Each structure stands twice: as structure tokens, then as C-alpha cells.
């Protein structure tokens, strides 16, 4: 946490849901007693990104639970009503992960853009981010999803979540197998793990004009010939959490 800017003393906890107990005099869209989900990725409030509700693009974020006191407490102060999302009638325990993992993959999937009926997307990693990505991708209308992991039990769960196909990437021919499963039309890869192996597989398996979206932060380096970027017309892009309107849209 220190590497991300946290200093002690600090109350952690960035996935927060609760009941509004008090509001300021200028608040008009939130009422006391309302059940809400907190958007924790608050920006500086002064830059162009913040003025355009693109808080995750702010270079001086003041994240609740990291740079502001978080949710591991009886009360949490939220500075503006736009950072609260109404979740009345929903199970808070089911909804609260969407303020982190949910909005992260939702933002990346929106950046991915639509795919044609004969095009495929691979979701690398079937942990919390990956499973959320599969579920949300299906809800967004993506149909041709290939789940990729090294754990067969997770791959079985990914199929149940909605993945059309699944592949264990420990196969020595992982790149060729992934291309085959996508019928030569792997146009998108969402990497929720973010390690050297997943990056290497992704950029080699993608078809021309494919899009590689990285949200996982396992760390490491992967290498590819620089000439691939123009010759394969590929997009390699990072994506970091999301913005407050996206969380409201996701919920």
C-alpha cells in the first residue's frame, strides 16, 4: 500500500456499501436512510479528467481506503453525492465488488468495443477479475468468449459463468490452440492477470487489428517485435478502474 501512496495512520477498505446517515445542505439526489454503493476512485477535482467525470484518468487520485479514510469503520465520509450509487433492493454483498473489480473490467470491455458475430475475445485469468469480466461481458452482449487459465476447475466455473470455450494455457502450443479455438478471428484479449506469459500469448495469438486490453497487475515483462504494432495494426492498451458514471451504468 505504501507503494501506491498510502501513509499511516490509515483506515483501509475501498469496497464500501452502507446506509446514508447524514447529508449536506446542497445534496439533492441522496436521502438519509438510502442504501448506496460508494465510488472510491476519487480524483483531485481540479483537472480536466475530473471535470469530465474521468476520475480514473486523474494523475492525483485521492482514493477512499488508500489516501482517504476507508470503509473498515462504522462511518465513511464521501465528499460528493455523485460518488454514491443507489442500490436499493439489491444485495449489498453481491454488489459491492463491482466498485472495484466490476468497474475495472466494465471500463476495459467498453474500451474493447463491439465484436462481429464471427469474432472472438479471450479473457486471460479466471480469478475474481476474470470471472467478473465473463459475467459482465455476457450481460453486455459478448457471445464468443474464450476463458484462459491454468486451473481446470476455474475453467469449468468460467464455462458455467458464460464462456463459450475454455483453454488451459499450460499447453505448449497455447498460441496456436488459442488461434484455432477462435477460428483465426481472435480480435480482442482482456488480460486480467497481467503477467509475462499472458502478455506473450495475447500479442502472438491475436489476429490483425486485434485489441489487447491489460488490467491485471501481476507484473513482469513480455517482449514482441516492435514492427508487429504497424504490421499487425494491433492495439495494446492499459485500463485502470473506471469512472463514476460507469459504475452507475454498471449497477
Q: Predicted segments — roles?
A:
Residues 215-216:
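Acidic carboxylate diad motif detector
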Amino acid at each position: 500500500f505504501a507503494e501506491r501512496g498510502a501513509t499511516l495512520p490509515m483506515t483501509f477498505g475501498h469496497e464500501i456499501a452502507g446506509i446514508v446517515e447524514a447529508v449536506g445542505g446542497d445534496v439533492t439526489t441522496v436521502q438519509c436512510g438510502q442504501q448506496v454503493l460508494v465510488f472510491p476512485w476519487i480524483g483531485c477535482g481540479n483537472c480536466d479528467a475530473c471535470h469530465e467525470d474521468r476520475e480514473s484518468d486523474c494523475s492525483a487520485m485521492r482514493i477512499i481506503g488508500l489516501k482517504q479514510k476507508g470503509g473498515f469503520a462504522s462511518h465513511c465520509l464521501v465528499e460528493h453525492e455523485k460518488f454514491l450509487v443507489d442500490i436499493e433492493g439489491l444485495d449489498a454483498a453481491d454488489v459491492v465488488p463491482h466498485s472495484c473489480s466490476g468497474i475495472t473490467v466494465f471500463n476495459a470491455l467498453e474500451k474493447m468495443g463491439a465484436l462481429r458475430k464471427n469474432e472472438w475475445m479471450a479473457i486471460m485469468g479466471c480469478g475474481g477479475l476474470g470471472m467478473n469480466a465473463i459475467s459482465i461481458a455476457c450481460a453486455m452482449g459478448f457471445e464468443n468468449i474464450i476463458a484462459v487459465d491454468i486451473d481446470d476447475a476455474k475453467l469449468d466455473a468460467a464455462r458455467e459463468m458464460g464462456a463459450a470455450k475454455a483453454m488451459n494455457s499450460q499447453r505448449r502450443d497455447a498460441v496456436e490452440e488459442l488461434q484455432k479455438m477462435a477460428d483465426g478471428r481472435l480480435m480482442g484479449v482482456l488480460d486480467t492477470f497481467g503477467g509475462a506469459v499472458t502478455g506473450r500469448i495475447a500479442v502472438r495469438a491475436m489476429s490483425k487489428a486485434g485489441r489487447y486490453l491489460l488490467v491485471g497487475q501481476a507484473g513482469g515483462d513480455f517482449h514482441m517485435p516492435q514492427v508487429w504494432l504497424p504490421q499487425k495494426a494491433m492495439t495494446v492498451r492499459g485500463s485502470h478502474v473506471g469512472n463514476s458514471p460507469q459504475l452507475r451504468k454498471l449497477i
